[in-house]
Each structure stands twice: as C-alpha cells, then as structure tokens.
Regions:
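Short loop/turn motifs that connect adjacent beta-strands in outer-membrane beta-barrel proteins
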Residues: 21-22, 28-40, 68-78, 106-113, ...
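Gram-negative/organellar outer-membrane beta-barrel architecture
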Residues: 34-42, 49-250, 347, 471-485
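Transmembrane beta-strand segments that form the barrel wall of outer-membrane beta-barrel proteins
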Residues: 41-52, 75-90, 98, 273-283, ...
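Transmembrane beta-barrel architecture of outer-membrane proteins
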Residues: 41-43, 57, 95-97, 176-180, ...
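Transmembrane beta-strands of outer-membrane beta-barrel proteins
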Residues: 42-44, 78-82, 111-117, 193-197, ...
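Residues on the lipid-exposed face of transmembrane beta-strands in outer-membrane beta-barrel proteins
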Residues: 46-48, 60-64, 100-104, 181-187, ...
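Outer-membrane beta-barrel pore domains and translocons
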Residues: 49-51, 63-65, 85-89, 116-120, ...
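C-terminal outer-membrane beta-barrel translocator/porin domains of Gram-negative envelope proteins
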Residues: 244, 254-257, 265-385, 401-403, ...
Length: 485
C-alpha cells in the first residue's frame, strides 16, 4: 500500500513539474470550479497493482494527454497509453504484457481514431471450463487426488498446504501467448449518435500447464513422465475442445456498429447514456483460422443523484452472442470493445464481474451487468491539479444464456480408449465429475471500492468483491486504474 501511495504522489509531482515548465500563464477555471488543463499532460509512474486472479503487478506505464487549448477539457483531444508490466504469484513471474494504445479525435477531420496493440503472456491462465455451473469447480476433489513430489518444490508446496491449507490450482490452468492489434474509427451521424467501424487481429497460442512439485490425477496418465493431467487436457481428451482448435489460432475480423454517447466526461462520467451495438465478422477468407460471427450490445447509464457529481448511480448491461452454433473455444473469453480500450479478457475479474474468478463464465451467448453507487466525498486543488476521492458500493453478475457443446460423444470415447485403454478408462471416468447435466445459474457478487481521481482522467482504484456462490470463488481484492465503465 505504501508503494501505491508513493506512486500517486509521484504522478501529482510529475504533472506539477510539467505544468511548471510552461510559461507563466493565468490559471483558468470551468463552470464546475476545476482548473482547465491545457497542452500536454504527462503521467509516467511505476505500475504497482494487485489482481486477485493474476497476483502482484509491477512495471511502468505512461499516460500522455493532449488537451490542446483546453476547450474540450476534461476530455483530451488525443492520448497515449504505454505499459510494460508483469505479474508475480507464489514468488514466480507467471505473466507479463506490453501495451501501446493511441486515441486521436483531430488527425482525421470528423473521425475519431483508436489504435490498440498488445502482447500478453500467461504461463498459468485460469480455465474452469464452459457454460458456467455446468462445469464443476471443486478443489476438494483436487485435494483428494493431488500428490506432492519428493523434490524441494514439492516439499515447499506440502508445507504451505499443511500450515495454511493452500492448494495449488494447476489443474485449472493452461498457458497462453496472445498478440492483439486493432484499429477503430468513429464518426458523428447526429448529435450524440455515431457510426463505428474497425478491424481487429489476434494470434493465440495455447499450451498445457506443467505443474512443478505436484501431480493431479496421476492415474489418468501413468506414463514415464508422470505429470498427471489438467482440465484443459481432459477437455481435449473428451473431444469438447476440437483437435484443430486446441492450440489456438488467428482471428482476423471486421467490425461495425452504432453508438449513442451523451456522457459529460468520458473517463469519469456523472451523467448521460453510453450505448453501443456491434457485429463482428471473422471469415476464413480474411485469414481467420476458424471462422466466427458475433454480435454484442452494451447499455450504460449514469444517473446523477446529487448535483455536481457528488453522488451518481451507474449501471451497465451487456450481452454478447454467437451467430451460429459454434465458435472457436479460445475466443469465448473475450468481450468486444470499440475505442481506446482493448477487448475485455474474460467474463469474471476486474474488467467485467468483480469477485468472480477469471474465465469462470464462458459460453456462446453470455450476458453480464454492473450496478454501483459512486460518491465523490472530497475534491480539492493541489499543485495545480484537480484532485478527488470517491467511494463506491457495487454488485455485479453474469449468466450463460446459450452454452457450448460439452458432449462426450461415443466417437470421442472410442478414440480415447483406442489411444491408451488404461489411461483412457481413467480419463473417461472423470467426465461426470467435472461436467454436470445442468444449465448455468446466476453468478453474482458484491463489494466496495475507493478511487483517487486526478484531472478527471488519471484514476487509481482499490476494490474488494465477494461472490455469493463458492463455485465462483471467495473474496477478491484489486488495485487497478480507471472505472469499469
């Protein structure tokens, strides 16, 4: 926490230093009493964050805002976001990412351009299966079939389990490398009503997770390597994940949509409506490995309860569906965004449903919601910066409305037994333990948060959420940036 506070102080000081280098210019205020920012505002700072799903995050980022002559403040005319960071969990670096985003409203007359690029590496990405509660999450079942190795890694894990009751979750993990590039364009049709068009490219490579120091379900793999198995590997064995999709692939997609946006402030809205509807087409002739066609709709509203943004009720309702009966499994965790933000990774976690385990909800058609009260309890000026603190109380939820085909067909069973009768029987017997004959239920959570807000754009969030069903996880704490919506 001390590191986070030091980071906030450093960003204020850097912004103040940048302002000090400008010519002595009279400070001007808008109708809300805020200092109108002009020119380039820099926000370099170390990344110090925490995500319950990925662990402690460290690295560096740069926020660069161009307010020009200030006539559009608090909305910048253009902005850059650059980040290089990594996550460490259990004293090991499990994932890292490199991101460069650029947004410009003036380069092309009448058109807003947003470009997002990123490389993401996850050595141990959460995977809990498809269709929500149809996939059983049961750590007690893992505990009964987990064996620690005799080496130092195994001894350390065994000690943690004995002293803290902490079980390794490698059974519910796989590895992933991901490259994402997108370019989106927005233009006004009528006041507050816009067209949207864009192109996105992603390359995904999936690998099995190889645990160190322990084995899960060793009876399912009695080979000389004795590495046990994982849910991802079992899904391949059961034929739920097709062979040609198992290792990932390329998605090359065209996007089109409409947007209504009457927000008063883009990054910290206190009133207005922001609604979007999109169609996404990724045919094979465009270079896609496995064609897919999707649609999405999102409605967000910000209702002022007390004037001047003191108290706001905000909510988001979102739905994403598949135009067909199938889609590549490795694309299901993503929810399409258009604009400066990259596509949300996973239904569950900080950007979609707080408290819910990352990737817990996956299906062909998925919906989710967020509802929260935001109370800006103090605001002041410090070193020529507009500073505010806000509290929030929220509830989030998600549901799979149409599921992915989870059948363990006779053909898949015969193929599994033919490959290796001994391990095949063991793996086939595990199907009924992890895939239930039921539809998804409602996943929900509730929590609260605190935010530091500078110049209506740079926002640091501290949030805690807890799920109502242990199948979705327990409590989750996050330190991150911005509002969810």
């Amino acid at each position: 926490m001390k590191k986070v506070i030091l980071s906030i102080v450093s960003i204020i000081m850097v912004s103040f230093a940048a302002d000090a280098k400008k010519e002595n210019k009279a400070v001007t205020y808008n109708e809300n009493g805020e200092i109108i920012k002009t020119g380039i505002n820099l926000g370099p700072l170390p990344v110090v964050a925490f995500d319950a799903d990925r662990g402690f995050q460290f690295g560096a980022l740069l926020n660069l805002y161009n307010f020009g002559n200030g006539d559009t403040y608090p909305n910048p005319k253009s902005q850059w976001y650059i980040e290089a960071s990594a996550y460490t969990k259990e004293s090991a670096i499990n994932s890292y990412k490199f991101i460069v985003n650029y947004d410009n409203k003036t380069l092309i007359p009448g058109v807003r351009m947003s470009i997002c690029t990123g490389y993401y590496k996850d050595a141990a990405l959460d995977f809990y299966g498809f269709n929500g509660y149809q996939s059983n999450y049961d750590m007690s079942l893992i505990e009964d079939n987990l064996f620690f190795s005799d080496d130092k890694s195994g001894e350390n894990l065994a000690e943690k389990f004995e002293n803290k009751g902490k079980l390794p979750k490698g059974f519910y993990r796989h590895g992933r490398d991901l490259i994402k590039i997108k370019a989106d364009f927005t233009g006004e049709i009528l006041k507050n009503f816009y067209w949207e068009a864009g192109y996105s490219f992603s390359w995904t490579k999936i690998q099995s997770f190889i645990p160190k120091g322990y084995t899960v379900f060793p009876g399912a793999n009695i080979g000389s390597d004795y590495i046990g198995t994982s849910l991802y590997d079992l899904y391949k064995d059961w034929g739920i994940i097709p062979e040609d999709e198992a290792n990932g692939g390329v998605v090359s997609a065209l996007k089109a949509g409409l947007m209504y946006d009457s927000r008063n402030v883009e990054n910290n809205p206190t009133e207005g409506i922001w609604a979007e509807a999109h169609v996404i087409a990724a045919p094979k002739w465009l270079g896609t490995s496995h064609s897919q066609y999707k649609y999405s709709a999102t409605f967000r509203q910000y209702v002022p309860i007390i004037d001047e943004g003191k108290l706001t009720f905000a909510y988001r309702i979102a739905y994403q569906g598949t135009i067909d009966n199938s889609a590549p499994w490795y694309t299901m965790p993503f929810y399409t965004n258009m604009g400066i933000k990259a596509d949300n990774d996973a239904f569950g976690g900080y950007r979609t449903v707080r408290g819910l385990m990352l990737n817990r909800v996956q299906g062909l058609d998925v919906g989710f919601y967020n509802a929260e009260l935001r109370w800006k309890f103090i605001d002041f000026k410090l070193w020529k910066q507009n500073i505010a603190f806000a509290l929030s109380a929220f509830t989030d939820g998600a549901h799979v409305f149409r599921g992915y085909d989870m059948s363990f067909t006779d053909e898949a069973k015969a193929k599994l037994l033919l490959k290796d009768p001994v391990t095949g029987v063991a793996k086939a017997a595990l199907y009924d333990k992890f895939v239930f004959d039921r539809k998804d239920g409602f996943h929900a959570s509730a929590g609260a948060g605190l935010r530091f807000i500078m110049n209506q754009n740079f926002i640091v969030a501290f949030e805690y959420a807890r799920c109502f069903n242990k199948q979705d996880g327990s409590g989750a704490f996050y330190i991150n940036t911005g509002f969810l919506f």
